[in-house]
Amino acid sequence: MSSTFKQYWLPEKKGFDSLQLRNVPKETPRLGQILVRLKAVSLNWRDGIVAIGTYPFPGPDAVVPGSDGAGIVEEVGEGVTEWKVGDRVLANFTQDHIAGRLTRDIGLTQLGGEQQGLLGEFFIFPKTGVVKIPDYLSFEEASCLPCAALTAWNALYGLTPLRPGQTVLLQGTGGVSTFALQIAHVAGAKTIVTSSSDEKLEKAKALGATFGINYRKTADWAAEAMRITGGKGVDYIIEVGGTLTLQASFDAIGFNGQINCIGHITNPDPLGAGKDLRGPDASFLALDRLCVVRGVVVGSREQLQDMLDCFEAKKIRPVIDSVFSFDKTREAYDHLWSSTHTGKIVIQIP
């Protein structure tokens, strides 16, 4: 057995060309740890902004990217009784977020940004840093769940649980929005998906979307959402745009609704060049609609397990846009940044 393994890292954060493949020593798990042979890692938009150096949270100057991975337990350390060699596991995005509220200190244990990530052949986890993969899911499918799926679950169930008959508006067809669509559909909710592409909207409808709005053809998608809901507005919004879409989200939300702020893809550098972009008066607009504006940063291990229980009961499968081999990781990043995908981008690890 080799004493080293292959791993991608970013010695500097100056773009996707900074990605380098290296050999690193394979260590033995210590007390309370497990060694996992990773079989698949999926990418999130966050991985892109980490690579280009605009990720707005603290982290090491040089980092191993990748937060979402799945694999097989290869070795267990002393004191580990929860896992055995051969178990199929997937990563918990925020390693120390076991249950309850996220704190700033716990947030510093997020993989692939605040601490070293998974884009390699092996990783040593604490025994609480993983959960069991449901039997019906492949490694590639399981690797899609830790960030995007759990974020969607937290958005719809973390504060006020979604109820049948309510309406959820989903911006775009990226990972979080697609998972939120699948979750809302099995919950009996109505869904409105916005996209710049009729083709993507057709794919969303195949997943159960009730309505689709092409915002290139219907620029005022908030007014269209109001029309669809008979002037009442929507109950939940998956807000991934940020500065340039937040006003429209306020225009589309109903009274006592919930705007879940997930990302800021219209402003990928919010603390740099984009910090001067003027957004809406959120305080006034929240009062005007009596709505909740909530930042959602993934979720806890407990929520991840709850989500997996639901997924297994309903046999929800992630939508995978494309699968790249480990040696095509750079191309996977390019595809991520092209915004032409629907669903998740996965990297297979041999």
Predicted regions mapped to residue ranges:
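N-terminal Rossmann-fold NAD(P) dinucleotide-binding loop
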Residues: 177-178
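C-terminal capping/lid region of NAD(P)-dependent oxidoreductase domains
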Residues: 2-5, 231, 315-322, 330-350
